[in-house]
Regions:
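N-terminal hydrophobic targeting/anchoring segments and the immediately downstream early-domain regions
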Residues: 20-36, 67
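Aromatic-lined carbohydrate-binding/catalytic grooves of carbohydrate-active enzymes
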Residues: 50, 54-165
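C-terminal motif of bacterial Sec signal peptides marking the signal peptidase cleavage site
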Residues: 15-16
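Second-shell loop/turn segments in exported
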Residues: 34-42, 87-89
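Generic cytosolic/nucleocytoplasmic N-terminal low-complexity/intrinsically disordered segments
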Residues: 1-2, 157
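Sec-dependent signal peptide recognition
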Residues: 2-10
């Protein structure tokens, strides 16, 4: 048994040292989100400007490929429960949300949008933004996913859980 143990160790070292191939490390998902700089004080022009800057300043080439419209775009839900964008911050309504995501895509970037898994958003909790009350995915998850992905053409949803029930 004592003779087999050193042979096993040598064999294990040879196999482990020769069978590994170096692999390229994938970078993490990188991009810009409106929350840290603007919280709920966002607008259509801020989002467009920031997306343009990602390309202009070379951040896209460095791997920053995502633009996320965070909390603050909410206006209210209509009678059918569909999200209507904030009328002052995004005065073009649903059509404008689609044109913003299309602009982001035209830059070769992915477009993201925000929601909360609960009933209310972080902005309603921390910034006293009344528009975030009832704006979360709770009881609207399928409806919001259809609107955000299919109608507004966003690629991903950033989901928080500030407004949990």
């Amino acid at each position: 048994m004592k003779k087999i143990y050193p042979i096993f160790i040598v064999f294990a070292l040879i196999v482990s040292c020769t069978s590994r191939q170096p692999q390229a490390v994938k970078p993490p998902l990188m991009g810009w989100s409106s929350w840290n700089a603007y919280m709920v004080d966002i607008s259509d022009s801020i989002i467009i400007h920031q997306a343009d800057l990602i390309v202009k300043r070379g951040l896209k080439d460095a791997g920053y490929g995502n633009v996320n419209i965070d909390d603050g775009f909410f206006g209210y839900r209509d009678q059918r429960g569909y999200m209507i964008p904030h009328p002052q911050r995004f005065p073009g309504g649903s059509a404008q949300m689609r044109s913003i995501s299309d602009h982001i895509h035209s830059l070769g970037l992915k477009a993201g949008i925000y929601s909360d898994a609960g009933d209310n958003t972080c902005g309603s909790s921390y910034n006293k933004d009344l528009n975030g009350i009832g704006a979360g995915l709770w009881m609207h998850d399928v409806q919001d996913a259809d609107q955000y992905f299919n109608n507004w053409n966003f690629d991903f949803i950033k989901i928080d859980y500030c407004g949990g029930i």
